[in-house]
């Protein structure tokens, strides 16, 4: 770890390296959420439109976006492993940034489905390499007893939210209003800024941090890894080819189905691996058992929350009034702008929850209660979305304020689930599987989006009310079940609350 001077106050009293990581993550999130804000629209926009897209069916477009999200979170396992065993965190982050940049450049080219699949592959792999490791780098800027650590992470999260907040406004406006490929170009430019900020700042402020892998392979293990990787790549290419040959017309749907299965099976393998490991003590196994209902609940939560870039995006474009008149003034709304409501309400509501938990102290609700209430709020947010269809039918346009209200309630639910889930994942983790348990939390999101790839195609005008109602009720029921069974879960959790 770098020897840091605690008296150095150049970035809100924090180490100067934090500014580098803040800027890197700001631009990476700008790139990620900017692209995601317009991706589904690009996929189903007609090829003959003035702002042409790929002309895919809406159901297929939503499934592709869901699978993309699932693989992004699944790839974080690979990124963490590469940093720990092969390259070190620093080089892994930079390589990931290069791959993301190349992916956005590929999306900016007018080569149709070919460039789409190449681009998504590069962005998925690059994000998996950058995302988990840059958070780890923030921690390495501080010694374990440095009181500035928590504040540093809070500042880092502000960078994430700021990038997420402005991305839909800039990339969305240009992408939908002018040209999709130009919008993707802006996302690529954002990643170039991220790469430059990281390269320049790393050399100046923390050249030694993350330079080497923490658990490097010996030469024999490295050779075996390269052989295994070569075999996996060859098998994947052959499988890809056979899947296409089996049914060219249904290739995309078959590909989505295969990836959905992978997204669901991987967490099961992880749980089995931890439960059967001889390194896990009996007390740790009980805590791991307590984590299962929380993990399953998180899948339900993320399945609803992650539909903001698919189902909610489609609803915003096809069902909301994009030219509302407020206070006598007519506004125009680009549908992609709705994606900024998520980070906006996170920014607005976070201080309220922080102050509430600080005030309650030891009297604040347990993890199980927070999870249950969060899921119930998330379910209620979807029940809110049934009202436009119930009140006025599903053929016309509804007020944009329905989406504002939905996001406000849903983000309140997220603040009860997401930070608590991160925290409890570390607390319930067996000593031998600390990093893997953090990966499990990301896998809950991955699994939820793998499931979404199968259920989002069910959403259409004729099923709108039923879809929102059933999905919302499921969220509420799961939340209620958690509250009912909280005592046996808390008993399994032991001293963790």
Curated annotation (Swiss-Prot):
Residues 56-64, 112-115, 174-181, 244-254, 313-335, 392-425 are extracellular. Belongs to the major facilitator superfamily. Proton-dependent oligopeptide transporter (POT/PTR) (TC 2.A.17) family. The gene is dtpT. It is a multi-pass membrane protein. PROSITE patterns: MFS, PTR2_1, PTR2_2. InterPro entries: Dipep/tripep_permease, MFS_dom, MFS_trans_sf, MFS_Transporters, POT_fam, PTR2_symporter_CS. One of its GO terms (biological process) is oligopeptide transport. Keywords: Cell membrane, Membrane, Peptide transport, Protein transport, Transmembrane, Transmembrane helix, Transport. Coiled coil: none annotated. This is Di-/tripeptide transporter. Pfam families: PTR2 (PF00854). Proton-dependent uptake of di- or tri-peptides. Its main location: membrane. One of its GO terms (cellular component) is plasma membrane. Residues 1-36, 84-92, 135-154, 201-224, 274-293, 355-372, 445-497 are cytoplasmic. The keyword Transmembrane applies. One of its GO terms (molecular function) is peptide transmembrane transporter activity.
